[in-house]
Amino acid sequence: MADPNKGINSLELNEGHSEWYVVTEAECINSLDTMEELFEESTDGSIVSNLIDDSEELEEGNSLALYNEQLTEDCNRAILALKRKLTKTPLKSQDRTVADLSPRLEAVTISPQRQSKRRLFEDSGLGEDEATNSIEKKVVSNSLESNESGTLVVETDSIFRSTNRKATLLAKFKEYFGVAYGDLTRPFKSDRSCCENWVISVCAAAEEVIEASKTVMQQHCDFLQVISYGFYALYLVKFKTAKSRDTIMKLFSLTLNVQEQQLMCDPPKSRSTPTALYFYRRSFGNASFIYGPFPDWLAKLTMLDHESAASSEQFELAQMIQFAYDNNLTTESEIAYKYALLADSDANAAAFLKSNQQVKYVRDCYAMLRYYKRQEMKDMSISEWIWKCCDDCNQEGNWKLIAQFLRYQEVNFISFLCALKTLFKGIPKRNCLVFWGPPDTGKSYICSSLTRFMQGKVVSFMNRHSQFWLQPLQDCKLGFLDDATFQCWQYMDVNMRNALDGNHISLDLKHKAPLQIKLPPLLITTNVDVENEASLMYLKSRLVFFKFPNKLPLKENDEVLYEITDASWKCFFIKFASHLELTARGDEQHESGRSDRAFRCTAGTNTESI
């Protein structure tokens, strides 16, 4: 085998014995000195201190934030030390109760304890430090304010985050006020319908604002009741003027600093006794505030008197008929409207409004009223009827205006009186007066005034195609046909000869059998000279003619010169009663010829003893 050391002269040199050595291989050095390390190590042996800054460079931070943080920690430690020094423990203060120290600690108990007795007045504070009480009260008030604000935010968020805000408001209303919102109000579909009385519910409003609204709202209303529970309030308001829902929503949203979604507004059930009792009973509680007297609808349902106690809620038609008869109401609309106005003072009228058959009652009342009036008129003679019409007129007039107007139209006044006398007596062939002449001569003027005074009826020939056009003549003492044309005279010549004679005829009535009747005295105006018309010769003997040739005189202001009114005819009949052979007024009878006892269509009632 070959020798590994061949060709190499091996020298064994001992360290220290020779200054030379042969480098056979390179040494492995792990770390080499860099330029920075050389400079850093060069100062290790320096005798000058801090000649070169060897500290590490630090990044510049937020010194102000650090200072505030340190200052806050120092303050908190100082406050904590002060609290520990001044606050007494329950073991050291036996006179103070747990409830006085903290309301929340009262609920945390290990063993059952007896509740402390309520004190009417706070402790005088002798022997205690005033600083302790002030600090405790301030801490408690701040915690309560934070709790209230947090609760208000939660209540508001629960409403606006709800998918059905209406249902949420209704549920909250019933939870706080103990009754459903629909039980107190009647819904208004339109937001522009006006009403004086309103019920307003407010949800999630600040207590301070609700308290301030009790004073602010007084300028807008006559009555105000506020029932408040925390952030919820219920208003019963009677405004000075009727307002709509839109107006009320804007008013309350500005006054209470809430949105319209937090409000509910509807009129109260003004005819519901439970609704009235709810607000009336709540008025005695501490949570209720009242300004002004109760509304009429609430007072009527809650306050009793001797009249309401004795009255019956059942509607009586006879009382309605008596009212219409006493007030001389002659149309259905007039009866319904004026009787409804009595609902505030008359129990029977209130029962009429509550009924679902008002239309039927009005028709029945009108029908019975016509029956009574018709028979009353038939039982009177023409003289009694004229005296009745005179009594109905409360004014005084001058009969000379009638005489002057007839003289102006060249009519003999004595002939006119004789014609009226035979007309009222119903003498055959003297039962119709005809006033004819040129237009605008006052024919219709004098006839209309006499018909109005005697409460007569007017018929028109334009309704001739109906067989019932003469039906109104059955309910009057005097009839009037205005402006009869030539065709009208031809119709009367063919169909009404017996009627003009003053004899009985068969009169067609709607929905009834023909009536045997004698037509009342008639007044007719026309522009046709019937007296000289050859084709109407058979009517001449049945009519009494008065010609008006002159145009009706007027004043400068276009008013009639001879103003003939009901008072003028009243004075005329009183003046010429003997000439017309009217029955004199008896001493034992009423002025109108009737008995002093008034007509009564209601059943008599016994007066209850008190």
UniProtKB/Swiss-Prot annotation:
What's in the keyword line of the UniProt record? ATP-binding, DNA replication, DNA-binding, Early protein, Helicase, Host nucleus, Hydrolase, Isomerase, Isopeptide bond, Nucleotide-binding, Phosphoprotein, Ubl conjugation
State where the record puts the cross-link Glycyl lysine isopeptide (Lys-Gly) (interchain with G-Cter in SUMO). K518
Q: What is its main location?
A: host cell
Q: Where is this region: Disordered?
A: 591-610
Q: In this chain, where does the modification Phosphoserine occur?
A: S93, S102
Q: How is it modified after translation?
A: Phosphorylated.
- Which reactions is this enzyme annotated as catalysing? Couples ATP hydrolysis with the unwinding of duplex DNA by translocating in the 3'-5' direction; ATP + H2O = ADP + phosphate + H(+)
Q: Does the keyword Phosphoprotein apply?
A: yes
Look up the EC number in the record and give it. 5.6.2.4
Positions occupied by motif Nuclear localization signal: 83-85
**GO biological process: any one?**
DNA replication
Tell me a GO cellular component: host cell nucleus
- Partners and quaternary state? Can form hexamers. Interacts with E2 protein; this interaction increases E1 DNA binding specificity. Interacts with host DNA polymerase subunit POLA2. Interacts with host single stranded DNA-binding protein RPA1. Interacts with host TOP1; this interaction stimulates the enzymatic activity of TOP1.
Instruction: Please report which protein family the annotation says this sequence is part of.
Output: Belongs to the papillomaviridae E1 protein family.
Main role?
ATP-dependent DNA 3'-5' helicase required for initiation of viral DNA replication. It forms a complex with the viral E2 protein. The E1-E2 complex binds to the replication origin which contains binding sites for both proteins. During the initial step, a dimer of E1 interacts with a dimer of protein E2 leading to a complex that binds the viral origin of replication with high specificity. Then, a second dimer of E1 displaces the E2 dimer in an ATP-dependent manner to form the E1 tetramer.
| Name under which the protein is recorded | Replication protein E1
In its UniProt entry, the species of origin is given as: Human papillomavirus type 60
